[in-house]
Amino acid sequence: MANTYLTRTPSSTGNRKIFTISAWIKRSKTGNNQKVITAGTSGTEGGLQFSTGTGENCLKFYEYVGSEVIGIAPNRILRDTSFWYHVVIAVDTTQATASNRVKYYLNGVQETSFATATYPSQNYDTLFNNSGTANTIGFLIGHSAYFDGSMSHINFIDGTAYDASAFGSTDATTGEWQINTSPSVTYGTN
């Protein structure tokens, strides 16, 4: 729905360096900035958004704190409004290699071609899992960009960076990426 959202503010701080976001999403509209999953408020924010500024209809993972600290935007364009997309963002800022600090999977495949690729510094503390920082699905507090579409099987994992195979698998007959409705994961504190 175009103007509904869920929000939760953690009462205790979890692991701000290592976490996983997994979500199945289906768009109703294309072409405008839409916030899918966020942490923070407008101006000090992070999360997943459909972005028109970095490549029309690109699903970007970002964090902005005065300037862009994280900006991972694949070249792949997501404009099919009849299709369910599965996105997994695995964050581990403790990694020595910058490109291992944020891994981006779309429909089971790790993305390797990016319009922008700004990785966080080593051991960076993100806005996610921070006590007192709002985590929101479908909106960003203080902003007007609601997500317009449907979402399913949203998982937020605190303390572990899982790859896409924890949340889905390829159908042996059709070759299509399919949902794992009961992922075997450890959710952590938040």
Model feature map: region roles:
Residues 1-18, 70-79, 141-143, 180-185:
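Short surface loop/edge beta-strand patches of beta-sandwich-type extracellular domains
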Residues 1-5, 96-98, 103, 112-119, ...:
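Extended recognition patches within non-cytosolic domains
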Residues 3-62, 95-98, 162-165:
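Extracellular glycan-recognition modules
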Residues 21-28, 87-89, 137, 151-155:
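Short hydrophobic/aromatic patches on beta-strands that form ligand-binding or substrate-lining surfaces
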Residues 23, 82-93, 104:
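Short tryptophan-centered beta-strand motifs in secreted/extracellular beta-sheet-rich domains
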Residues 62-86:
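Short, aromatic/His-centered strand-loop micro-motif at the edge of beta-sheets
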Residues 125-151:
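Extracellular glycan-interaction patches encoded by glycine-rich segments
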